[in-house]
Structures are given as structure tokens and as C-alpha cells.
């Protein structure tokens, strides 16, 4: 499609050697695969719009996949903070006497109705042919938080880019795809 061709002008797709099988740590049949970019939107309608603009995508369960991109989505918040009772405070169970509870890092737990969606996104994130993850959640603090909670829960270690969408027109989506922002640039939104 024109969006794919435009984004790949003058660029070679990332490639990574992958071992099909190994025996005592030695690769028997090494092969090179083209790495894909996983785009995670905040809601299904946005994922559909992005997939439509990219073009050449096939619906595969609850995500879209093409030669270069996979487009999946959350359903808003998939995780929430664990209840205070889940934290061990001062060698005992939580009580009001222990307030405020300020652990170094808050634990997350899946929202029951969204647990399956989180599990499916985790599978996409861990795919060996996914080289980069793009945050296409809503532009703003809330969208940034939704995405970062997903990354934290799935223990994602892959490079992250930000698709900053302020409009859902095909032209705006194409423009944002050509101007992906770095994860470092978006860090202040998460704090």
C-alpha cells in the first residue's frame, strides 16, 4: 500500500537471525526473518482505522496482520492497581494505621473482564518476529498510562515508539506514521 511504501522509502526492513531448532545450543537451520512492528491502539475502532490506512492487513482473531505490521488493541484500561491488602506493610497485614501506603512500585493486577485481552496482547508482544512496539493509545496521559501498564505487566523489553494521533483521518494517521516519536520523548507523560 502507499502508506507502507512511503514509510519504507530509502529504508531496509529490520531483519533478525532466528534459530528454527537448536541442539546443544547450536543452531541447525538458521534463517533470517523480516521483523514486524506491533502497533497497540487503545480501542478496537482505532486499531481498525490504523489497519485500514496501512492496507494489506488481514483480520486474525482480535488483531490485524500484514507483511510489516501487526495491529492490536487494548479495551481501555486492562490493569488496575492492586488493593492495599496485597502489600505487606511493616511485617503484617494492612490496616488503616499503616496509611499512607507508598510502596516503591505499585503492583498491578488484570481487570477480570479484560484478562483475556491482556493475555492475547502479551502473546503478540513476545512474538519472535516483532522487533518494535508502537504505542498508538490515545494522545495524552491516560493513553500513555494504559500502554505503559501493558508493557509493565507483559515485561516487554523491545524498542518502543509513539504514534501520536490527534485526528483519525487517513491523512493524519499517515502523517503520524511517518513521524513516530521516541519513547524517551514521551516519558514525561508517564510521570
Predicted regions located by residue number:
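Cysteine-centered motifs
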Residues: 19-20, 27
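Serine residues within intrinsically disordered or low-complexity segments
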Residues: 1-2, 7, 22
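Intrinsically disordered, low-complexity regulatory segments
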Residues: 31-191
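Mature cores of small secreted peptide/protein domains
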Residues: 24-25, 32
Amino acid at each position: 500500500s502507499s502508506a507502507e511504501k512511503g514509510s519504507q522509502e530509502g529504508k531496509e526492513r529490520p531483519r533478525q537471525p532466528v534459530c528454527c531448532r537448536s541442539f546443544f545450543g547450536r543452531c541447525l537451520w538458521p534463517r533470517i526473518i523480516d521483523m514486524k512492528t506491533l502497533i497497540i491502539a487503545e480501542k478496537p475502532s482505532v486499531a481498525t482505522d490504523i489497519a485500514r490506512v496501512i492496507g494489506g492487513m488481514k483480520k486474525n482473531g482480535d488483531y490485524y496482520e500484514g507483511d510489516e505490521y501487526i495491529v492490536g488493541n487494548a479495551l481501555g484500561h486492562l490493569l488496575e492497581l492492586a488493593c492495599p491488602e496485597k502489600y505487606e506493610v511493616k511485617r503484617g497485614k494492612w490496616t488503616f494505621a499503616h496509611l499512607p501506603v507508598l510502596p516503591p512500585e505499585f503492583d498491578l493486577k488484570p481487570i477480570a473482564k479484560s484478562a483475556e485481552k491482556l493475555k492475547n496482547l502479551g502473546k503478540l508482544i513476545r512474538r519472535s518476529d516483532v522487533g518494535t512496539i508502537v504505542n498508538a493509545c490515545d494522545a495524552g496521559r491516560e493513553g500513555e498510562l494504559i500502554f505503559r501498564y501493558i508493557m509493565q505487566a507483559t515485561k516487554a523489553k523491545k524498542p518502543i515508539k509513539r504514534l501520536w494521533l490527534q485526528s483519525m483521518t487517513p491523512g493524519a494517521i499517515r502523517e503520524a506514521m511517518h513521524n513516530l516519536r521516541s519513547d524517551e520523548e514521551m516519558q514525561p507523560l508517564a510521570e
